[in-house]
Design a protein with these regions (language model features):
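Conserved PLP-anchoring active-site segment centered on the Schiff-base-forming lysine
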Residues: 112-132
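Short beta->alpha connector loops at strand-helix junctions that form conserved
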Residues: 121, 140-145
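N-terminal small-domain helix-loop-helix segment of the aminotransferase-like
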Residues: 10-101
């Protein structure tokens, strides 16, 4: 590997594989370039055109070249805090971080978190490699068809007892594809 000869790479990173979703997307583009008809069911990219009012707004702001605040646009954070306050959540703009996407925000969360991660399976393909990069210990929590791929209080208690008194972060991929869930189920788990 040319990178390994140019610089030393941390051992725990040497066996990381490329993102499977991006690898699949690259493979579909390769097949399409060779004339194959490909039906994409896995990549989370919308097949719908961008609404014209959004395109116009982006064009109006294309000349802005300043770095954004590290927590995101203040006006947007204030608007989100106001919206949450209307729903009885007590956050202000300083409690809110705007990011370029969920994957990046989940990565930052795992960098900051000092504890062990509970990862229900199946889950989004990026969370486990992110944990490896951040040297977080991961405990997989198997879900099953009978429970509609949802966490159950019994399984959560079992894995929590195994981890003990260490801090725990549960990365929940809900609403779960394809089965979905409802807020009441998540509230029940969070109260546990």
């Amino acid at each position: 590997n040319i990178i390994n000869t140019l610089m030393d790479i941390k051992n725990h990173l040497l066996n990381l594989q490329p993102s499977s979703t991006l690898a699949i997307n690259e493979k579909t583009k390769e097949l399409e370039s060779k004339g194959s008809k490909v039906y994409k069911f896995g990549f989370g990219q919308s097949p719908f055109p961008i609404p014209s009012d959004i395109v116009e707004e982006l064009a109006c702001n294309a000349s802005k070249k300043e770095y954004l605040p590290s927590k995101g646009l203040l006006e947007l954070r204030i608007a989100i805090a106001k919206n949450l306050k209307g729903k009885k959540y007590l956050f202000d703009q300083n409690d809110i971080i705007i990011g370029p996407g969920t994957k990046e925000l989940m990565f930052l969360l795992q960098i900051a978190f000092d504890g062990e991660i509970i990862l229900p399976i199946p889950s989004w393909v990026s969370y486990f490699p992110q944990a490896i990069i951040n040297r977080n210990k991961v405990h997989f929590l198997e879900t099953n068809f009978e429970d509609k791929w949802h966490l159950t209080e019994n399984k959560l208690k079992e894995i929590s007892d195994k981890i003990g008194n260490k801090k725990k972060l549960i990365i929940m991929n809900y609403p779960n594809n394809p089965s979905g869930t409802n807020p009441k189920k998540i509230e029940e788990l969070s109260s546990w």
